[in-house]
């Protein structure tokens, strides 16, 4: 299941390389990222993160990404290609060029950002396509209180790197993560910084 890049029959294709019809940026505006001739899209720094128009609960998400190579010798740590995929706009799996690029362990590629380090660094070199297959079990809230936490299982290039780990709350760079009650919400791809990276072949399956 995790090694076939073609979406299964019950998948919702979020990006097929032709347009941004399933995405918006801040203010429900058209994304200003670039669609390339090879069917990928590239982040344009400063143009804002993008969000799916549809909201989701628990899902299986497939996404492919490629770290950029421009001026790579001048960048290290978190200043290489750096982004993130956020489930329900709150819970981040880090996207980072972590190939021969040391950084803090819970901020490397495949980390549940600032919460769980990956079991292994499965990164390929910049310029090579990589894949994440993410199983996201959404948190459950009742009367605005947490009834059941969320969980992540993640495969990076087909290798298990997060094994049903508990999500402690909304991703935060500083301080302790906390939950705030919410319902289904969009998937977000982050416009963060540094060397632009690309995405392709994004699809999702609802698990509830």
Describe the role of every protein-language-model region.
Residues 1-208:
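Carbohydrate-interacting regions of secretory-pathway proteins
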